[in-house]
Amino acid sequence: MRIRINNIKDNAMIRRTVSCLAMCLSAVMPLFAGNTDGQFRKILDEIERNSTTLAVYGKSTEAQKIGNRTGLAPENPEIELGYLPGIHGGARKDIGISQSFDFPTLYSRKGKLADAQNVSADLQLRSRRMDLLLEAERCCIELVFNNALAALYSRQLDNAKAVADAYERKFRHGDATRIECNKAALNLTNMENELKKVNLERRQLLSRLTMLNGGVPVEMADTSYNPVRQLPSDFRAWVLEAEAANPAFAYLRQEIEVAKKGVGVSKAMGLPKFSVGYAGEFTPDEGWQGVKLGVSIPLWENRNRVKHARAEVAAAEQAMDDARLQYSARLEFLFEQCRELTGNISRYESVFEKNSNDELLYRAFTGGELSLLDYLLELEYYFNSYEKLMQTQRDLRLALAELYAYEL
């Protein structure tokens, strides 16, 4: 933001301008006084209830779990009927009924594999839920920041309008040049565009939250954040706790169990397959009937099946190790970022609380030590510093949201 105004001689107008600037600055102060309520919990709970995306994930998980339990029963029974008429009369009639079944060990292991796959499906649903709620929380954090910016820019826009109107009046009375009026008008246009840009971003964030909420409109006018929690003192121990509680890692661990149970199923598929049934053959003069038994020995069909299953286990374990490494590195980066941002915020707030530059600038201006142009430029620097503080507050909340996403 840039304020570019030349000196103004109209004392009444100067007082109104300075008064407007003081109101603008005082409005910024509350932006960083946080509430102690659960700031986004209500919105996140509502999104969890209304989200069509989560509903789709839920239905998909149910279908997947049903599919995992499909095919665990024995094969269908087989019935054969034959009628063979003779060349010289008479006919032979055949009948056969048989039931094939796998070795009992295979059914047991298939059932355990299906149970493990169903647990994995539930954990995947929890992981997807965490990702969706984290996205919603990020939108809320960005929305608070843009709400605060909109409040700040609205005040500054009022000031820009007052300055532009004052210059227009002075120009009509011959006390200002057209160039000075154009500068004031350009400053007003810049502030209008900044406010429109922020309001557009706010509408986009609200639209995104509404979509995440299943089409139900979301309203949030907060302009401040909750106080932040203290970072853990023992980072390494905390990373282990975070990993243990993170549903994404629970899903990866379960995928390893699924792969291991797949090895057991593959081994059991190398066991013989049996069939039992009834067979009958009848002619006009004679009839034969009795029980028939069969066995199928899988000599070639399951070749490399166990080897493939073991490779799946190795791949799942490697994926887990890679995810653990990336997660730890990401958390360490976010942890250090939070520490640095917290220090930056403390330094900003300490300077603002102790120095009260707005009052010092005002006294210097009213005492004749600063021209209005110098006063406005100094005040602009003060506003820009507050914007940086707001951005730092936002960045800290975004980093913390990702750090503690596993708690959602």
Residue ranges and their predicted role:
Residues 1-41, 408:
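Bacterial Sec-dependent N-terminal signal peptides
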